[in-house]
Amino acid sequence: MATLRDIRRRIRSVESTQKITRAMKLVAAAKLRRAQERIVAARPYAGKMAELLGNLVSSAGAHDEAPHPLLVQRAGPRRQVVIITADRGLAGAFNSNIVRRARDFIRQSSAPDVTLVVVGRKGRDFFRRRGFTIKRDMLGFWDRLAYGHAAEIADFLMRQYLDAEVDEVHLIYNEFRSVAVQRPVLEQLLPIPRAEAGEGRATTVDYLYEPSPEAILGDLLPRHVRTQVFRALMESLAGEYGARMTAMEAATKNAKEMIEVLTIQYNKARQEKITKELLDIVGGAEALKQGAEA
């Protein structure tokens, strides 16, 4: 049975852990608010760009005519997967869900040659240990995430695609739904999907473009790819903070419950010790009394 000293030590240890989890929850909540604000601010821009892209593709000609190399559909087997995870843990199933989704996609892929671009230390370490081919990784920028980081990743992916080193590029990340819900998402990034590029989309306004739609596409399509990568990074960052906030809230609650249980154990053990000491005193007094009478 645990001694009073052991129970006190455990209570102090759990209280110390509770302080840490509570602080981590507060930090994650503050960062989550800022991340949510960035997502809300970015959505109108991304939506308008998608609308303009659809009109431009329609104006430049049928999609099958491939008005830009980033729209070219190739039948090759080389596939690249961009996997976005966090650098740190303590975020519930945030990283494991992405890793599981990526492994399932790779297993089900008919492409014999699959290479990875991994964002985040957790994903990099996991796939490196299992011998996957990692073309590139990016780590240590999450606390200062900027558009430049997304542009660096997107430009690397576009170079790979335009140089015909890969035939498809897919993106796997956690989409932020709410503080408690992050959904693993798989999207095709390159070639830009037909629906995303506006095929079949009704054009309600007939725009006149200067310069030509083809010339504008040459600038807009790379911007679109960079924007999609940046959006995925922001979604993942907000999801990480939400998952960590939820996990730390649960850990803080569990610590509180454990402290209550340990406190009850401590009080019972202390009461038993006091009762035993009283019985010893009473027993000793009785023995002395009987000795005196004899």
Residue ranges and their predicted role:
Residues 1-294:
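C-terminal beta-strand-loop-alpha-helix "lid" module of Rossmann-like NAD(P)-dependent dehydrogenases
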